[in-house]
Amino acid sequence: LSLMLAQLNLTVGAIEDNCDKVLAAAAEADRQGADLLVCSELALTGYPPEDLLLRADLMIRVEAALTRIAAWQGACAILVGHPWREGEALYNAASLYEQGQLVARYFKQDLPNYGVFDEKRYFTAATETCVVPFRGHQLGLLICEDLWQPGPALAAKAAGAELLLTINASPYDQEKPWIRRELMAERCDQTGLPLIYLNQVCGQDELIFDGCSKVFNSQGE
């Protein structure tokens, strides 16, 4: 299984431009023979979108962008983060598209509400685990804070995941690279699964997103 991790420079609110970057990355992944392009948490809106999530037109623009992604006919599948509304609930979501079809849609379970994060103001926390059969492998999908708590990763393992795939919008601070590394190694040790971690690279106001995407084997190395 070949994955391309897209550490894209995304802009909050620039949904159409962000979608262009996702599709350009998908075309490059296709040229290189990748099976799956992995994009970051809330890639279509940029992170953190904050009160833009309260605008009535936001989901119209997000749905238009997702329609463009679904229409892409390359051999490479696309995993992309975006907000998604069901009824009155707004979710922090990740969707997997393959050759015009929605294969899976996962909703974030653990919402951070400390420091620079205020996701509980906007999003509903989900409870469902998502393990996706994809080209002979079972992918356990996670979004950022889901990895910081043991429950979602262990639930994915119990549901048959063979690989943990987590998309993130994790801002930099001086200690964060080492904290992340220890955390990911711990999850691998707890689950016995390999882990892929994808983070964006950009600046949003006072926040810096430093990428540092990583691939760990099942021993946490």
Residue ranges and their predicted role:
Residues 1-221:
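Enzyme catalytic cores with a strong preference for nitrogen-chemistry domains
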